[in-house]
Each structure stands twice: as C-alpha cells, then as structure tokens.
C-alpha cells in the first residue's frame, strides 16, 4: 500500500475562533483556543480513512500580521507566536492586516489570507506537491478551491476538511454532490494539541 503525502492548510484565525466557540466562552483567557499547528497536522495524519496510510508532508498556517507601527505589542506577540510555529516545522504565510478608517474603534481585518490559502491549495495540487490536502477552516470563501481540486483532480488528489465539534458547533466545508472526509475534533483532541502560551509576555 502506497503512503499518501498529506499537507494541511490552516486558516489560523478561523480555526482559533472555532475552538473558542466550541469549547470556551468570551470570558475565558485569550490563550484558550490556541493550538499547536504541527501537533494538529500530526493528529490529523494519524487518523486516516480506513485502509489509508499517510505521512505528514507540510503544515501550512495562514495568518494576518499586525502593523508594527500601529500595534507594536500585538505585533511582537504575533511574531513570537509565528517563531514558535516555525521552530516546530510549520510554514507560516502571513498577510498584512487592513486597518479601517475608524481604527482603533473599529478592529483591523484580515485581507488576503483566504486567497493565499486557496491559491496554494489549488496550485500545490496541480503541481503534485501533496496527495491529500486538508483544509482547517469553515470559511466558505475556500469552497471554490476545495471544489476545483475535487472535480478536476480527484483521480490523483484527495481533498479533506477538519473542524471542531462541540455542543454548539457542527459546521464544515463541503462540496455539493461530493463525499468529502471530515475530521471532527472533540474537546479531548483540542486539549492534546492546545498551546497555553501567552505570547504577550
């Protein structure tokens, strides 16, 4: 049996927010919901569908990057977190946050993170850089990329998704008419890959 190369594509903010919705409240510390992306990839790789054998090829995590001049403390914390991810083998793809005219009363927004993830998911499939691509996000803007790889490359590439499952969270990315494997992650799964580090300190 051939070993399939698995790469996971993580939308950092979306997956963090999903963990908080599934397992925590707004009153919990901001570190609640943080996770180790490489541990996430290892966990996913260890739970393949029946009769599949997987090896972890890449862990790619996509994130918005604060402006160092506007939010120096937040920027420093972000860079420490990214350095921690990279030290364990993750590939970090960062895009600058967009600051609206009403900032700081209005929060900055991610810009281009989902586009970068979608482009990499498709181009890496076309280039044969993975056999199995897993998207860790519920952002519906990523559905076209998921659908493209499934429809055009399903004979050579497998697409899968993952999300947290709690008392109030049961969402996942899907493609109409497709049977796409989803790794549902429970609270005990989160606890096994949680990152309790406060990068502000």
Predicted regions: what they are:
Residues 1-108:
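Domain-level signal for Mg2+-assisted phosphodiester chemistry and nucleotide/NA-binding surfaces
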Residues 91-201:
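Nuclease catalytic cores that cleave nucleic-acid phosphodiester bonds
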């Amino acid at each position: 049996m051939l070993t399939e190369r698995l790469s996971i594509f993580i939308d950092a903010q979306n997956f963090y927010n999903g963990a908080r919705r599934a397992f925590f409240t707004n009153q919990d510390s901001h570190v609640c919901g943080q996770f180790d992306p490489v541990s996430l990839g290892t966990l996913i790789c260890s739970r393949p569908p029946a009769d599949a054998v997987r090896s972890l090829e890449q862990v790619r995590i996509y994130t918005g990057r604060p402006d160092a001049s506007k939010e120096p403390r937040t920027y420093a914390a972000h860079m420490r977190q990214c350095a921690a991810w990279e030290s364990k083998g993750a590939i970090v793809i960062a895009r600058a946050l967009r600051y609206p005219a009403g900032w700081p009363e209005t929060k900055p927004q991610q810009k281009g993170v989902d586009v970068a993830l979608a482009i990499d998911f498709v181009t890496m499939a076309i280039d044969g850089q993975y056999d199995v691509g897993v998207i860790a996000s519920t952002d519906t803007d990523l559905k076209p990329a998921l659908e493209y790889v499934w429809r055009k490359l399903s004979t050579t590439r497998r697409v899968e998704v993952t999300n947290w499952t709690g008392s109030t969270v049961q969402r996942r990315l899907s493609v109409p008419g497709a049977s796409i494997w989803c790794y549902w992650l429970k609270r005990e799964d989160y606890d096994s890959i949680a990152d309790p580090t406060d990068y502000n300190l």
